[in-house]
Amino acid sequence: MLTAVPITTDSKDFKEIKHLYIAAFPKSERVPLRDLLRHDGASEFVAGYDGETFCGFYSALTFGDITHILFLAIDERLRAHGYGSAMLDIVAAAHPHNRIIVDAEAEDPAASNN
């Protein structure tokens, strides 16, 4: 079971979060981290923890009854253990009446982050 923790620059695993963000998403798709850290009511940047272990994060924007997951990444050492699904469950629980939108890409075997 994952625990959701809002991410700030003071987060204990901020360096690891930043590293995962850079490793998981191509530069052309990333936005500045400061934009993800805004926490302005419409945006969320949340880490998932299994006990004390940082597993991954998501970033989402909510407008009305739509929550759009912009970024979701799981530490590569922890993939295929259900953490991605658990992270989606966290989003759904935080927004029980919203439609959840997730953009997904097919794996590209030639991509450097595969």
Language model segments and positions:
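Active-site rim helix/loop that mediates acceptor-substrate recognition in acyltransferases
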Residues: 22-50
